[in-house]
Amino acid sequence: MIQLLSFLSISFLYLYSNVFGNSLVSIPTVVLHGIASSASNMDNFSNWIETSFNTKVFNIEIGDGFKTSIYSPLTNQLVELCSTIYENEELKHGFNFIGMSQGGLLARGYAEQCNKYQVVNLITLVSPHGGVIYDFNWYAYSSFLQNHLSIAGYWRNPTELDKYLDKCSYLPVINNEKNTSVSDIQKTNIKSLKNFITIWSKNDELIDPPESGKFSFYDEEYNVIDIEDTILYKDDLLGIKYLAENNRFHIHETNCTHAQHRDPICFPQLYDILKLYL
């Protein structure tokens, strides 16, 4: 009788966790590297996630990793990313997606435009959601660089917003800053996330401005505009405001440098954040 009761108790807990979502076994997690990087650069991070949060981790890369992350436009990388995920049957019931830097923009692109295998929690580490700009002039909005350099896809010159909206091939599309054939589905898919977590750092020496990691960016005078004051948020172009109002959009901050977010030195800070969602 005792053995029977034990069996029934275990069976009930199993059914409860699967039917009501009170998960006893974590869903899988996908990790995606950033620019000028590859899956091997995320090995320490992926192993730490797997052991710390009892989740099976798939540490993936696009193309050959390093070269593809630099020289392939993000529109092409996104197509390959979606195909790579759809090849993995273990992800078909849903997964958490952690994207590092540029990888966070691709992870968000997957959640918005693909998502046949649904993203549950979308987590981005120091990802330039607001774009990047640096102290030199170049032809970022030329068709050549848009087609041959990934960073051009999220280059945002605050003094040339018309060019950004017209010529930039990736970020204004996934931000719903311009109306496209995928605008409605992107907003629907973002609103379907259980949680959208952005992690940024004032000590991020690579992303300019660092606040881009939380959807903020410069105005024409190079003053940082808080996310709540952006058109993207105020007009809820993408569904971020909807998530925030329902306590499903979360901004967290570390004091790590950009690359440290994938290294053990930053793990204690990341643990305190990620334990809330994984």
Model regions: which residues?
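Surface-exposed acidic, glycine-flexible loop patches that form ligand/cofactor-binding
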Residues: 20-22, 86-91, 114, 181-190, ...
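Short hydrophobic segments within beta-strands
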Residues: 30-35, 98, 199-201
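Serine-dependent carboxylesterase/thioesterase catalytic core
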Residues: 33, 75-166
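Helical cap/lid subdomain of alpha/beta-hydrolase-fold lipid enzymes
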Residues: 121-278
